[in-house]
Structures are given as structure tokens and as C-alpha cells.
Amino acid sequence: MARPKNVKHIFVTGGVISSLGKGILSASLGMLLKSRGLRVAIQKYDPYINVDPGTMSPYQHGEVYVTDDGAETDLDLGHYERFLDEPTSQASNLTMGRVYKSVIDKERRGEYLGGTVQVVPHVIDEIKEKMNDLAKNGSLDVLITEIGGTIGDIESLPFLEAMRQLKLELGDRNVLNIHLTFVPYIKAASELKTKPTQHSVKMLLETGIQPDILVCRSEKPLSREIKNKVGHFCNVHEQDVIGLNDCETIYAVPLMLLREQLDLRVMKKLGLKKFREPNLEHWKRFCEKVTNPKDGEITIGVCGKYTEYPDAYKSIIEAFIHAGASNDVKVSVKMLRAEDAEDSSFNMNKAFEGVSGLLVAPGFGDRGIEGKVQFVQYARENNIPFFGICLGMQCASIEFARNVCDLPDANSTEFNKRARFPVIDLMEQQKKVKEKGGTMRLGSYPCILKEGSKVHEVYGKFLINERHRHRYEFNNQFRKLFEEKGMIFSGTSPNGELVEIIELKEHRWFVAVQFHPELKSRVQKVHPLFDGFVQAAKEFAMGKRQLTLEDELPRLSSEEMEGAG
């Protein structure tokens, strides 16, 4: 198989409306090209002026996805990693804020030799230089770049201009544009409407870019007639109009695009030849397990502060899909708003109806903390499988200190700087940090597991590496007391100073971690902790069903019992 001499660039843009799924499209195409033997990477360009999403509200941006090298990035990078099973990095996410910051820093250093710094050429040249960063080391065949925003947005124009110039410089055989649009279905007319797509392409043409391939999102499949009409009015061949209708799971998208031959159209246009046929049997089996689990459904409660906006917990939800497939069940997530438990009229028994496990999610700030602590207490006292992540571990520590160690005023100094029993405290190296952005303990760090612990059993090894995003840690002054009361510190930093994992031996599953395991769960590599947690929740659910069944069976009299013998 002959490698291309130059890295091939694929740019994915979106039109008509936002949230069409450019990230899923990019990840799916990347997976298809990788399955053919090509070396693929994906990057995301966001048009906002923030340097990174690290300080942005989860309500506005969703979760912050942390890479191994400590970059705080867009949640779409999570899709890239889950679909490609390849790590991303700081270079995989560029914001317009970082571009402007770099240009201004260069101006301050005098690198522009007294010239007037302008969007064209200086900002555009900076973007083009960044576009090639991932391609410089010679380890790639294809680089896919997702351009955030919607065609027509002012913010995206510099990215589009850089893309236009790059295509002019490198040629059609090296740069390709895929434009994702929306074809709405009008129920009153019982037909799909192509006019929004036509207008979106018209706006893209106004920037000097002719799309090479159109991918049309729709509620229903596109007929050949519709594809022909779209192609005719948008100046692309009918075979370059790809249908992408709604499906049960996002993991079915690569299979749909394979049937539509998107990967073949891309390879032909970029002159990529003699690559192997894709083998996606493993992916098909996974999708079958997701859509038709043989052991039914279980419900897991996710207690958080941002439950109105599920994208704030995107990687957690996806990790449950992976773990559900691994355990032959569908995991239905029930969002539990932490603040609700702080109301005196709140019924905890009702909140846990039908729930077979509790995950207390990450977050920042004191809002809803007391509610989270109450949820942890209920799960611990009722032997319900429990899993805490980051802030969830800190809440589990506070709850254990108050209700088991008899430290009623236990708290974190994040919520009460004068806490009498600060079982969670600011990390020593964080105490002189003043700025918010990019200053936490970020990225991948090693952790040593305790032999014989639950986590050692599920990981099957002693040394692990997990991704972190936190400023506060367990206060070691309380370790001895916790251990005396039954808490196991089953994971620590290699020097033993930083507590990474806690668990309870006598509980069916009570594990809490300081890191973010959801960020490393993959389709073919379900994260061991999610796998173990879902398995415990499944066993708990089956036990409850068995008890319910026994209660519903008619009770036989002693005479009937003797007769049955």
C-alpha cells in the first residue's frame, strides 16, 4: 500500500442550523478511513474568543474534555478519541482566542517589524500555520479539520478564508471540503425541503469555497430524486450528495456513511488508491449490543449540578453506553438534580425508585454540595452500587467523615475555608496560583493500585494512568481515621502522597476516584471502572427483580406444599 506523498486535508463545515453533528461526521469519516489502513488525525477549530473552554460554563459549552497532555478542549475531541481510538492533544483544538493571542504576542515582540497587524494576512497566516501543526511530523496520511459554528457566522470567517487559501495553495487533490447541511421534513406537505441547503451552499460560495461533497442530515432517508435536485442546484454530482438520516445510536453513523460510500468518494477525490477493504464486523456487533441488549435495561442515577444540560456529562453518558454493551444491558440514565435533595420536602426513596446504581458527577463550587452528600449517604447506607468521580469522590469523603467518622462539621475548604475538619483541601502547589484558566492539575498522571482491592481486580494491574482536572485533594491528616473506620485507600500517586481512589470493602460497589475515567472509555475498550460499576448495578437490579418476583408468587398453604411433594 503506497502512502500519499502529501498529507491530505479534509475540512468539515456546517450550515443551516447548529448541532447537526459535525463532530460525529468527522469522527465517523476518520474511523472509516482508518479502517482502510490510512493514518488519520482530527482537529477542531472553534471560533470563540476564549483561549480554551476551561473557564466556560457547562451550560454554554458542555463538558470540558481533557487530553493526556493536559489541554482543556471541546467535547467533540471526545468523539474523535472514542471513534478512532487515537489520543488527541493540545494541537487538536484551536480557538480564535488562541490565534489572536498568538498574533498579539508576536506583535509585542516586534516580529512584524513595525507593520500594521491585520486579519489579512497576519491572522490568516497564523491559522494556516496552525492547520499544518499536526501534519508536520510525517506520521499522517489524512488530517480532518472540523470548523465550528455555522456558515454565515461572522466569527468563522477567518477560518474559512484560511481554508480557501490553503486549497488554492495545495490544490484540489490535497484539500477537500465536506459541507454538512440540514434537509427538513415538513409533515404537513409530507416531503423533504432542499431550499435551506441551497441557501447554505450559496453562503459558502460567497466565501469563495465550492463544497466537494454535501452530507445532508434529515429525519428520513433521501431519495435519489432529492439527491439529484440538491446536486443540481448546489453544483455537485449526485453521487457526492450523501444522505445521513436519524438513527438509533450515533455509533451507527459510520455504517450508514459506509453504505453511502462517503469514504470511497473522499478517497477518489484525494487520489488515495490501493487501500484495504474495511472490516467493521466488530463495530456492527457493538451497535447490535447497543440497540438490542439481550439482558434488558437498568437505570443508573447521575447526581449532578448541571442535569438540565446532558452535554455537561457527555463522556459519562457515552461511557455508560460502552459499559452497557459490554454487560449486555441498556443503561438508562436518570438525571438527579443535587440541589433538589436540599429541600426538606424531597423524598429520597422516591428518587431512587427503579435506580440500580448512583454516580455522583464532577463539578465545581458549593451549589448543590449538601444534596450530593445526602445522595452518597443514601447509596452507602442502602448498599446501592456507588461511583464517585472527582467532586463525587470529595463528596463521598465528606459524607464518610460526617456520618461514619463522627466529624459532623467535615467539609472541603473549597466550600468553607474555615472548615473545622477540612477532609478535602487545596493542593499545596495550587495555593499561590491566582489565574483560573489552565492552572489546575491537568492531564494524565500515574496511579498505584492496592493489591486485593476492587479496583485492582477490575483493572487487572498495579500501575494505571488516568486524566485529571482538579485543584483540591484528600487531606492526609484524616487518612488514619478513615482507615480505622473501614475506608480503603486503594489508589495513590506513586509517592503515596495523593489519594486517587477510595473504596469500601463491605459494600457491593462503593468506589470513588479523583480522576476522570470517562475520558478514556472507548467503543472497543470500555473503561474497567465503568464496566465494573455497570456489572454491579446489573447484579443489583437482577437481585431486586428476583425479590419482586418472589413477592408476587402466590403463597401456598402447608397442605398444598405437602401435596406438591
From Swiss-Prot:
GO terms for biological process: 'de novo' CTP biosynthetic process; pyrimidine nucleobase biosynthetic process. One of its GO terms (molecular function) is CTP synthase activity. Residues 1-272 are annotated as: Amidoligase domain. Transmembrane segments: none annotated. Pfam families: CTP_synth_N, GATase. Residues 299-543 form the Glutamine amidotransferase type-1 domain. Pathway: Pyrimidine metabolism; CTP biosynthesis via de novo pathway; CTP from UDP: step 2/2. Allosterically activated by GTP, when glutamine is the substrate; GTP has no effect on the reaction when ammonia is the substrate. The allosteric effector GTP functions by stabilizing the protein conformation that binds the tetrahedral intermediate(s) formed during glutamine hydrolysis. Inhibited by the product CTP, via allosteric rather than competitive inhibition. UTP binds at S18, K193, T194, K195, P196, T197, Q198, K229. Mg(2+) binds at D76, E146. Its EC number is 6.3.4.2. ATP binds at S19, L20, G21, K22, G23, I24, D76. Keywords: ATP-binding, Glutamine amidotransferase, Ligase, Magnesium, Metal-binding, Nucleotide-binding, Pyrimidine biosynthesis. GO terms for cellular component: cytosol. HAMAP family: PyrG. Homotetramer. This is CTP synthase. The lineage of its organism: Bacteria, Pseudomonadati, Chlorobiota, Chlorobiia, Chlorobiales.
